Amino acid sequence: MIASLDELYHSELFFLPAMDKNARLVGLEIIATFATEDGAVRMPTELVAPRLSVEEQYCLFVEKLALLETCQHFFIQHKLIAWLNLPPAISGLLLLDSELFSRAARFPFLELAINENYPGLNHGKENETLAHLAMHFPLMLANFGAGEASTKAIFDGLFKRIMLDKNFIQQRADMISFEPFMHAIVAQISSSCESLMIAGIDNEAMFARAAPLGFSALQGGLWPPVPVSQLIRLVQR
C-alpha cells in the first residue's frame, strides 16, 4: 500500500511472534512499517496511522488479509493464532461490507485486536458496533493498562484474549512489587477472558520473571518481527 504523507511511503508487513512460557510459538500479529521509496526512512504504524485516510486504512487491512491468505496453511498446520489490528474506522465497514466480512471470517484462527482508545470502549456491550464485532469475531484487547479505558468491556466478556500494554509492563518491571502486581491482575481478569498475554518482554531476564506468572503468551523485543519468508524458522527447534 502507498501512503501519501509528506512524501510517498509504502507499507511493509511483518509477523510479530507471541511465545508461551517454554518459548514455543503461540501466534503471530501482522504488523506494518512504512518506508520511503528509497528505504532511507522507516516509521512504525503507530506514527503513521493517525495520518492515514479511511481509504488507506482499509487498503492496509485488506493487504494484511491478503498476506494471511498466502500463509494460512502454516497457521492451520501449526495451530497458531493470527492477530490483526482493527482500526476504529474499519470496524463499522467490516460489519457493513459483505465482501470484507467474508474475507476476514474465512480464517478460523484469526482474532481482531483493538486498542484501549477505541471509541466508546468504556460502554462495553452497550457499544453496538463492538458488541456485534464480538458476536462474529474473536476480539483481543491489545494494550490493556495503557490508561485510556475502564475495565467495563473486559468484565462484559467482549474479549477472548487480553494483552497487557508493553509500556505499562516496562514502567513496572523494575519494581519489587512487579510479580505480586501481575499475580493480582491475572487473578482479577482471567475469569473474564480465555487467556491473558503480556507484552514488553525485551530480554531473557524479563522473560525469566514473566514466564511463571500465568500468562498464556509473551511478546516483545526478545522475539523480533520476521518477514513471511522466515516464518518457518519460528517453529524449528
Swiss-Prot record:
Residues 1-237 form the EAL domain. It comes from the Bacteria. InterPro entries: Cyclic-di-GMP_PDE-like, EAL_dom, EAL_sf. Transmembrane segments: none annotated. Disulfide bonds: none annotated. One of its GO terms (molecular function) is cyclic-guanylate-specific phosphodiesterase activity. It holds the Pfam family EAL. Acts as an anti-FlhC(2)FlhD(4) factor by binding to FlhD, decreasing its ability to bind DNA, and thus negatively regulates expression of flagellar class II operons, decreasing motility in nutrient-poor medium. Required for resistance to host phagocyte oxidase. Belongs to the YdiV family. This is Anti-FlhC(2)FlhD(4) factor YdiV. It comes from Salmonella arizonae (strain ATCC BAA-731 / CDC346-86 / RSK2980). The lineage of its organism: Bacteria, Pseudomonadati, Pseudomonadota, Gammaproteobacteria, Enterobacterales.
